[in-house]
Regions:
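Surface-exposed amphipathic alpha-helical segments
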Residues: 1-3, 168-199
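Signature of long, low-cysteine stretches enriched in small and polar/charged residues
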Residues: 14-16, 21-23, 29-164
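Short acidic, Gly/Pro-enriched loop/turn segments at secondary-structure junctions
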Residues: 2-13
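Short beta-strand-to-coil "C-cap" segments at the C-terminal boundary of structured domains/repeats
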Residues: 6, 43-48, 196-199
């Protein structure tokens, strides 16, 4: 479980760096192959949007989005526009995303103006699912999942993430379930059912 703990801490460090507060839950289960564990992170979307969107506070699109978050409802036309825009950003083939890259520093010598980090960190996104509405939920809910490979130098950690955006009026929440890729088949139905039954 050392590997899982380490990769979970790295995922949470990203949220910490962004200044986003979150709740975290540990899920445990067992089957014939042994003990299983996963993390479930819950982010208050309204609070995060206000924190990250300070510059856009007067932007009409930002105001409209915040109003939708308050109402807990997105009309069908806006939903199609949003899903279209979001899904265009989701890689359709295996994609490597650099998490840290060259650092630009001021220098008279252009050869020395870039410093490469000692350890390159990347996240490979594979089999990413399009964001889609979830039927049979109390609140409007959208979900997506993906297999991920987190690489930190020579260490690679295969992960699985399953996310749901639940539009609870006044308190919309983004839930992200994270587990190791080998536990994906065990946790996928658990995550899916949990996201459907949020009250």
């Amino acid at each position: 479980h050392q590997m899982t703990r380490q990769s979970n801490q790295q995922a949470l460090a990203i949220l910490d760096q962004m200044g986003i507060s979150y709740d975290i839950y540990q899920l445990q289960g067992e089957d014939k192959s042994g003990q299983k564990d996963a993390l479930l992170v819950a982010v208050d979307v309204k609070e995060a949007a206000q924190h990250l969107g300070k510059k856009e506070a007067n932007d009409p699109m930002f105001i409209a989005a915040m109003t939708a978050l308050d109402k807990g409802q997105i009309d069908p036309v806006t939903e199609q526009l949003l899903l279209g825009t979001i899904n265009k950003q989701i890689p359709t083939s295996t994609t490597v995303v650099p998490l840290n890259g060259p650092i630009n520093v001021s220098s008279r010598d252009p050869q020395k103006a870039t410093i490469m980090p000692k350890t390159l960190r990347t996240l490979t996104v594979e089999n990413a699912e399009q964001v889609h509405p979830v039927a049979g939920t109390k609140y409007q809910t959208y979900a997506a999942s993906s297999r991920l490979l987190y690489a930190d130098g020579n260490v690679q950690t295969p992960l699985y993430a399953n996310a749901a955006f639940v539009l609870k009026p006044g308190k919309p929440v983004l839930y992200v379930g994270i587990t190791t890729d080998v536990q994906r088949d065990y946790f996928k139905p658990i995550f899916d059912n949990a996201f459907k039954s949020i009250k």
